[in-house]
């Protein structure tokens, strides 16, 4: 049975170069042929945050490319196109995810079963610097990605402490380890 919709692979191949030119990559494509109208969701991510203007521009370009399909690939009927960022519910699973989450608060589950909450710092050679609360100040703990079982960005409703954010933005992994800064 044909759905009249392109496959996930076809959408990625069709849109990938345009998204890359804008500085974003397609993380996932979800096609729901059972929805009415059918839905094509394109999840994009990049080093720069995906703002509303960029989403609108990417959506317009994606729509034009998808509507321009012809022959056997032509989309039959109406469909709903969604272009969005991965959102906070997406687990961080690769170096690029941690690099893009720098400065964000995350909760980690480690391979030994322990949990840590901290702010993502520098990502280097398979190791992430995590700024954690220690006594009355902040410390940087280096954690190999291989030891992280699960990592999820936490939603924050108040700004971080300046010293915490400064450590997370520091580009010298290891220099700040064990140092204390005022809360």
Swiss-Prot record:
Major site of localization recorded for this protein: cytoplasm
Top-level division of the source organism's lineage: Bacteria
Gene Ontology biological process terms in this record: ribosomal small subunit assembly; translation
CDD domains cross-referenced by the UniProt entry: YlxS_C (cd01734)
Entry keyword Cell wall biogenesis/degradation: no
Compartment(s) where it occurs, according to its Swiss-Prot or TrEMBL record: Cytoplasm
Any Gene Ontology CC annotation: cytosol
InterPro entries registered for this protein in UniProt: Ribosome_maturation_RimP, RimP_C, RimP_C_sf, RimP_N, RimP_N_sf
UniProt keyword terms in alphabetical order: Cytoplasm, Ribosome biogenesis
Something else known: Was identified as a high-confidence drug target.
Alphabetical list of HAMAP family matching this protein: RimP (MF_01077)
Protein family per UniProt: Belongs to the RimP family.
PANTHER family documented for this protein: RIBOSOME MATURATION FACTOR RIMP
Functional summary from the UniProt entry: Required for maturation of 30S ribosomal subunits.
Name of the featured protein: Ribosome maturation factor RimP
Gene (name only): rimP
């Amino acid at each position: 049975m044909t759905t009249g919709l392109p496959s996930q692979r076809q959408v990625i191949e069709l849109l990938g170069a345009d998204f890359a030119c804008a500085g974003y990559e397609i993380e996932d494509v979800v096609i729901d042929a059972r929805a009415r109208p059918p839905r094509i969701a394109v999840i994009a991510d990049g080093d720069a945050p995906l703002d509303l203007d960029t989403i609108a521009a990417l959506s317009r370009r994606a729509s034009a490319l998808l509507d321009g399909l012809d022959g056997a690939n032509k989309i039959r009927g109406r469909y709903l196109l969604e272009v969005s960022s991965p959102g906070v519910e997406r687990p961080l699973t690769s170096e690029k995810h941690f690099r893009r989450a720098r400065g964000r608060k995350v909760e980690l589950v480690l391979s030994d079963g322990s949990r840590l909450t901290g702010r993502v710092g520098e990502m280097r050679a398979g190791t992430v610097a995590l700024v954690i609360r220690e006594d009355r100040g902040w410390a940087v703990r280096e954690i190999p990605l291989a030891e992280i079982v699960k990592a999820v960005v936490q939603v924050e409703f108040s700004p971080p402490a300046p010293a915490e954010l400064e450590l997370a933005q520091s580009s010298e992994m290891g220099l700040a380890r064990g140092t204390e800064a005022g809360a």
